[in-house]
Design a protein with these regions (language model features):
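Buried hydrophobic residues that stabilize the cores of well-folded domains
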Residues: 15-305
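C-terminal motif of bacterial Sec signal peptides marking the signal peptidase cleavage site
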Residues: 9-12
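Sec-dependent signal peptide recognition
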Residues: 1-4
């Protein structure tokens, strides 16, 4: 979770629709982001160092319910030109083994073609490759070591996650296949899932998932017309599948309606988001609510400074 928050913050808030410029424009990037829980207590705080239009480092601190820091993660960023070449992460807390790693990025022009994550305190490397058809992402393949059993012995195999993207107008079908390859080449633990996204005006407006014949889920989203600090030119490079993430649309999320059909019964959950904005139409705060018994109840907030 820490890594996802850090990389999201790292690539946020540069100016979009400015050619291929990936540098940060003044007034669009929050140097400090504070996350609070439903009771108004600080859950985490992210502070970034910016020089020359680039984030050189960021540090996130996680707090327990009593407001005591329990975990930190610091990122040191290295660039090649205006593209991120390396992210060195040092973590402390309950599991520093998994919070300390180095991630390197390789490009073809400005397209990300490979990322490699090397953990510092455990022997583990995760590699992800990306393929494109023109400007469209078509395939991602992630490989990582995994412990498995072969011939009665515990051995190291490789877990594969293959993600394919098919485009049809506003609809994007995402097929994800996971499996384990043993040292002998035997394939086991195969699983395939499908998700369908509808993207309009740079925002995901619907996500459809069929988990089983008796369980289906449809999620519908609405947005404001302001600038989303989580999407920009650098986002599109470093996170090539950004376009299926609701939090990385062109605008800011206003409502989420989750409709689940389980065994012919329908269940609906609604979430709401409210914002304050600066004079550049970027959010300075977000309040999150969830609807229960027809009433909106606080579910957390974010402050941008």
């Amino acid at each position: 979770i820490l890594g996802l928050v850090a990389i999201a913050a790292l690539v946020s808030c540069t100016k979009e629709d400015n050619g291929n410029d990936t540098t940060i424009q003044e007034g669009t990037f929050p140097k400090e982001v504070t996350y609070k829980n439903e009771n108004g207590k600080v859950a985490s705080k992210l502070v970034s160092l910016i020089e020359g239009g680039k984030i050189l480092s960021s540090e996130i601190e996680i707090y327990n319910e009593n407001g005591t820091p329990i975990r930190t993660q610091k990122d040191i960023i290295t660039y090649e030109g205006n593209l991120i070449k390396k992210r060195e992460t040092i973590g402390t807390g309950d599991d520093p083994n998994y919070n300390s790693f180095t991630e390197t990025f390789s490009y073809d022009g400005t397209k990300l073609v490979k990322s490699v994550t090397d953990y510092k305190k455990i022997v583990k490397t995760i590699t992800t490759t990306y393929s494109y058809d023109g400007d469209k992402l078509t395939n991602m393949v992630k490989t990582e070591p995994i412990q498995t059993i072969e011939n009665g012995q515990r051995v190291e195999g490789t877990k594969y996650t293959e993600t394919n993207f098919t485009y049809n107008g506003d609809r994007i079908t995402v097929k994800e296949k996971t499996y384990t390859k043993k040292p002998s080449g035997l394939i086991t633990d195969e699983n395939t899932s499908f998700e369908i996204y509808t993207v309009v005006g740079g925002n995901v407006v619907k996500k459809e998932v069929t988990y089983s014949p008796s369980l289906k889920e449809t999620i519908e989203y609405t947005y404001d017309t302001k600038n989303n600090p989580m999407v920009n030119n650098l986002t599109k490079i470093i996170l090539p599948d950004y376009f299926i993430e609701k939090s990385r649309g062109r605008n800011n999320l206003l409502t989420t309606t989750i409709t689940q059909v389980r065994n012919n019964q329908t269940f609906v959950t609604k979430r709401y988001y409210e914002y304050e904005y600066n004079n550049k139409d970027y959010p300075t705060s977000q309040k999150h609510f969830i609807e229960e018994n027809g009433q909106k109840k606080p579910a957390g907030s974010i402050e941008f400074q």
